[in-house]
Amino acid sequence: MAKYVGYKRPKDTKKTVKHLLTYLGHYKWAFLLIAILVFISAGAGIMGTFLIKPIVNNFIVPGNMKGLIIAVCGMGVMYACGALSTLGYNRLMVHTSQKVVSEIRMDLFKHTQKLPLKYFDNNTHGEIMSHFTNDVDTVQEAMNNSFAMVIQSFLTLFGTITMMLVLSVRLTIIVVVFLILMFIFIKYNGKRSKKYYHRQQKELGNINGFVQEMMAGQKVEKVFNHEQKNFEKFCEMNESFRKESTNALAYSGMLIPVIVSLSYFNYALSACVGGIFVIKGIMDLGSISAYLVYVRQSAMPLNQFTQQVNFILSALSGAERIFDMMDEAEEPDEGKVTLCNIIKNADNTITETSDKTGFFAWKLPAGELIELKGDVRFNDVVFGYVPEKRVLNKISLFAKPGQKIAFVGSTGAGKTTIVNLINRFYDIQSGTITYDGIDVMNIKKDDLRRSLAMVIQDTHLFTGTIADNIRYGKLDATDEEIREAAKIANADSFITRLPQGYDTMLTADGGNLSQGQRQLLAIARAAIAKPPVLILDEATSSIDTRTERLIENGMDAIMEGRTVFVIAHRLSTVRNSNAIMVLEKGEVIERGSHDELLEQKGRYYQLYTGQFELD
């Protein structure tokens, strides 16, 4: 079972905010309009409250009913403008935030496709998926609910304190002291909450990864009767998640009650002192009336902010994890040699063409063309998935154009590693791998892989029709080409027997097909690409003997003129290879044809006669 690596602690919140602002900057005019509407909304509330002073002093106390009605109507118009502005920025914020989050999600997916395989080796699928779901959703929710509210809260608080200073400096000192106490508590509580929210997200990633693995491995789980054991494991993980969630919510839940209590006490003290000021003639009745409303308004922005703290914390944590993944180094590609289509001239020269001729050449940076023939060589190659643990130890081998090379050996001998290195899924630590005399490090990875096709034992099919899955090897393939490729792989017969034939929809990973049928489709997908080099990584180990013979006959057609690498569990699949390489502990210990190796009576002979089992 894959081990959850875990989220890293936030390294630089400022960097995360700066990165987020880069995306917001793409919609600066929309956010500018939102800011203007927020300013109008906050300003309307502040100025509407200030009208209480003249209304009380000039109309209520003197008993001026006509003036009171006009003043109240003016206040109503001002509040209506504020309400319309609030409605406007909320609608605009929803539309804009959706665009921002959609752009982040697209960039994240695009970057994910460029990450090296070792990243996926070290991170569970559940953890990676949580970046696209949980983390992106928290950013979106915070933008919808918190962005405009935080700005409005700041403007309202700033404007309120300013107007309070205008009305009474001495009373405002009392309010500011309470606001400072509230701010200190919010900062302390936020720091503690953020730590627990981080742990909560880590535990959620654990659960996601575990559940995904269990769903993918249902058959294995049932065969070995691990249901109860896995349930107990899930209960442990669920309990850890519950504890961290409880701690996070406990701290965040303290905010509102404490802030509300402080605001009530602040209001009572301000009312008491303000009443004394009115009795002594220091303030008039209108001023204290407006002032007490401002006291309540000064607490509202902080209350609103505390309600959004949870969203802000989750959004920052989610954004940090998203941008951490986006900051992961992309798969390196320093290659400048490209692959191009060519025309073979009568005088044995070659010419580049934009037409798809089925003939290829390597185009060097200087413009020189080297015909692609499929000559692959390893020279003293050293490699290990972990640098200090070698998998291949100064291995040297070669495959001449058109040869079929087979690899046999026990688990961990390095068979699959060799084909991984041919594809440059990983880079070697020393030595060289050449392709038609060109170091593969100098070939652009996209072009290198375009010259290869690979069929692996754990066949992966995509949701879609059978035709779509075969066409994956050549996106512009015609229906006739698809059918021809299926015939080569001997898949046409079972496909045509299906009710909808080539238009049959496949469920997740081709679950409605047998293992053998899935492999036949994978072979058809490779056949339609017509690659110069073909890699069969244990491609026929799960297919019955009869189907295997049909595949071997069909594969002869696409192998002609191509270099083919084969890894198989069955020695019968490699007998007709030009060369068989026996691998042991990352080294080639025997090389030769089937008959030559039998004559040597070495490890291959022992495997063939059953003295050792072939893995």
For the regions a language model picked out, list residue spans one by one.
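Helix-loop junctions and hydrophobic alpha-helical segments within the transmembrane domains
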Residues: 108, 112, 221, 322, ...
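Membrane-integrated ABC transporters
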Residues: 1-45, 60-71, 89-93, 97, ...
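ABC-type nucleotide-binding domain
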Residues: 340-615
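Alpha-helical segments in transporter systems
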Residues: 18-21, 29-50, 54, 71, ...
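An intracellular "coupling" helix at the cytosolic face of ABC transporter transmembrane type-1 domains
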Residues: 117-118, 134-143, 147, 151, ...
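Helix-loop-helix
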Residues: 61-66, 70-71, 163-177, 247-320, ...
